[in-house]
Amino acid sequence: EIVLARRPKVSLTTIILAAGKSTRMLSLKSKLLFKISGEYIIEHVYRAAASINSKNIVCVLGNSPQQLKDFIQKNKIQSVDQKNSCGTADAVKTAISSIPVNKNNKVLILCGDVPFISPVTLRKMISKLNNSDLCLGTCIQENPVGYGRIIRNNKNIVEIIEEKDASSKIKKINEINTGIICINEGVLRKFIGKIKNNNKQKEYYLTDIVKLLSDNDYKISSYTIKNDLETMGINSKKDLVDLERKLLIKKASNLLDKGVLIRDVMRTDIKGDLKVQKDVEIDINCIFEDKVSIGSNTTIGHNCYLNRCKIGKNVHIKPNTIIFGATIGDNCIVGPYARIRPGTVLKNDAQVGNFVEVKNSIIGSRTKINHLSYIGDAELGKDINVGAGCITCNYDGEKKHKTIIEANSFI
């Protein structure tokens, strides 16, 4: 009888480095709590870690502003405190000491200020550990100022030298370390405590583990990340704005390539998840946040703001309109200067005109509210004509009350 040995169970731990002081943001709050593309920077990183089935996700805090610590606690994210701010190796050592030992595990290390690393890239890096002990995420940059340089010997990575410790010759190397590292847990635990602080900053650099592994004949692999949006970090408000602008232009350009008529990709901000059908036209200065879907043959006028809403087909959203948390049926006309608030449903062929606000209401088919009105907590049937200046008085100072107007009425 042949007895096959069981393969050791392998799982993934992700460590997010978030212990920085955020001094270059010139702000009282952590840079990780600035929003980019509609969400906090730390949320983007955490989602990437969660999407690749990390068994443990540990966020390393330290001198982080209190708002970040409160956010981590509120969202029940596992965290550890780095008591002394003395480098990334010490941060990783603190994190790895907080989880149960499993030398067969893989450990992924992410930077908390690099928001757009993709799950696809992370999976490819992790798969490289099947044939190596450590995988580095690298990229080629025309202007690599500020980044650690990748040192190779006959194509093999032997060391990473940080910018502050680099000679003028090494600074000419344009292959840089992205800060994203995947390593076998057993190897990490063996070498993390051997890292020294023999550098100008007197810090314990995690990147020094590369030379330790190379000197001890461990196998080091790399994965070149070609999309620069995935590797761009945020240290200042300028970094934040520059990265978001690049992302927004890319999103708008992708939709343009798919047949959406976007009048100006430089002035269209898609900050969330925008799904668009055929023959949609979007004018300038429009902002889309959270999940927005737009049906075919629909036109969005200039200066519109759409957030968490569903727009039907053959709809005309006129300029300067705000739609938030609402559903707009087919063949509707909305605006200009209309405000459609959460809980509102416009049935097919309804019309809401200029300076009209609708909140938490159902507006029936072919019903028209064309001028200067407030409709709140109401249910309007079909084929109603609401004249200018109408208000549904929904609040008595203590409670909200519903207004019902039945079909074919004229107000």
Q: Predicted regions span which residues?
A:
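Conserved N-terminal catalytic core of the sugar/cofactor nucleotidyltransferase
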Residues: 2-8, 13, 39-124
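Structural signal for interior beta-strand "rungs" in well-ordered beta-sheet cores
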Residues: 261-411
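Conserved core of the sugar-phosphate nucleotidyltransferase
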Residues: 66, 117-200, 207-209, 214, ...
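Residues that scaffold the ATP/ADP-binding catalytic core of kinase and kinase-like folds
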Residues: 24, 160, 191, 243, ...
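Glycine-rich N-terminal loop/short-helix segment of MobA-like nucleotidyltransferase
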Residues: 12-36, 52
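Conserved alpha/beta core of the MobA/IspD/sugar-nucleotide pyrophosphorylase nucleotidyltransferase superfamily
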Residues: 153, 174-277
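Short beta-strand/turn micro-motifs composed of small residues
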Residues: 18, 61, 111, 138-139
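Active-site metal-binding loops of divalent metal-dependent hydrolases
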Residues: 21, 113-114, 286
